[in-house]
Amino acid sequence: MEKRMKLRVSRIVRSSLSSCRPRDLYDVVETCAVTSKATSSERFFVTKAKTKTPSRPKSHASSCPRASPIFPPNPFYEESRSFRDLRKKVKTNRKQRSQFGSDPLFASRFKSTGSWYWSCSEEEDEGDKEESEDDDSDTLFSSRSFSSDSSKAESFAVVKKSKDPYEDFRTSMVEMIVERQIFAPAELQQLLQCFLSLNSRQHHKVIVQVFLEIYATLFSP
């Protein structure tokens, strides 16, 4: 029994030693060559596979439009606008002043010496030099009636030298409101635009101030 055990142990030791012995140079070189071929083929396959991968066209990348935020309009914007903002947006183009006579709000024709009149002075188109020399010249509305019936009354604009533009504009605006029975907010705003269009910019501040005071008086609780 002991001899058999020794033989088995010796065989196990020999097999382990034989596995640990160095291999021949030929085997090592052949194994490395096979390994290098395998790795090179794998690398070539990977590289080839990458080149064959189809790229996504750029035209489809941005085909979907970007989502933009949509803000609902404010329905109370028009009602909440102050008259100061309205004054800034009033156009002062003198070429449009001739259209004032055909305004449906004021059915009567505003006349001055038998012709359409919409400037502060007859030489206004020559430049602003005359305005600087004649700063106290204002175009005011006069509600003088040629008939007792207000619906048939005719009014005209007058040019006058004024030392107190505030009082003159206030008197003229009140006369127009009473004569034409202008009490609706929309009609009052249109009246303000008419005053601004007929007068130079240097008087717009006074006109708006007078209008705001009259408007507050009419609609005060």
UniProtKB/Swiss-Prot annotation:
Keywords from the named record: Nucleus, Repressor, Transcription, Transcription regulation
InterPro entries found in the cross-reference section: Ovate, Ovate_C
Role of this protein: Transcriptional repressor that regulates multiple aspects of plant growth and development through the regulation of BEL1-LIKE (BLH) and KNOX TALE (KNAT) homeodomain transcription factors.
Free-text disruption phenotype from the record: No visible phenotype under normal growth conditions.
Any GO CC annotation of this UniProt entry: nucleus
Tissue expression remark: Expressed in roots, rosette and cauline leaves, shoots, stems, flower buds and siliques.
Transmembrane segments annotated in the record for this chain: none
Domain of life: Eukaryota
Main location: nucleus
UniProt source species: Arabidopsis thaliana
GO biological process, one term: negative regulation of DNA-templated transcription
Entry annotated with the keyword Nucleus: yes
Family matches, as NCBIfam families: A_thal_3678
Record's subcellular location: Nucleus
Comp. bias (Acidic residues): 124-138
Database matches in Pfam families: Ovate
Boundaries of every OVATE domain copy: 158-217
Region Disordered, residue ranges: 124-147
Gene name for this UniProt entry: OFP8
UniProt name for this protein: Transcription repressor OFP8
